[in-house]
Amino acid sequence: MLNKETFLGEAFKRLPKELINKIKNKKIGIAGAGGLGSNIAVALVRSGIQNLIIADFDKVEYSNLNRQYYFYKHVGQYKVDALEEQLKNINPYINIEKHNIYLDENNFDIFRNCDIIAEAFDKAENKEKIVNYAVKNKKYIVSGVGMAGDYSANIIQTRKLGKYLYISGDLKNEATDENGLLASRVAITANHQANMILRILQNKYEV
């Protein structure tokens, strides 16, 4: 295996040099490791992020394989463990702090030392709670809302709602029994979130 310096030089040589210098010591919190969280984490690691805190209580199920960044072999594993494996297959030198816990207002403080939080929950009430935590603590948070169905990808956007809150998605199409989730729209939303995180880290606050 290549040593760290050589590997990072090769792996990141196509990235903007300004980006690499600004993000190399930054830490991102990933709240949820499902369809949004797993894809956000992959995009960030491929973009040069080297420090992550990832939290989720769930295990990989067969029904996750249609949109989450896991493979057949991961079914039955805790998502935080499976995602760590996936990310270290991209960059073996990244630093990952993982928490196999159900996130709520009693433990959001695991993200207190993060520069930005990526919100990747399923339920609206949980999204609201962590957004309130982040804004109260003057911490940037990028949330995902509205990515279900096979609607046009062009209605997925990122919006700035206040100094610390950004929301990616179409803001209306949530998953139901009739309105399922496609890998394409979930990944587009997740990559909107990842891209906004990278912009904020470079002090580019406009969407």
Where in the sequence are the language-model features?
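Glycine-rich phosphate/adenylate-binding loop
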Residues: 2, 27, 109-116, 120-207
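Conserved S-adenosyl-L-methionine
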Residues: 46-51
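Hydrophobic residues within alpha-helices
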Residues: 40-41, 83
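N-terminal charged helix/coil linker that caps or initiates catalytic domains
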Residues: 1-28
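Hydrophobic/small residue at the entry helix of a nucleotide-binding pocket
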Residues: 36
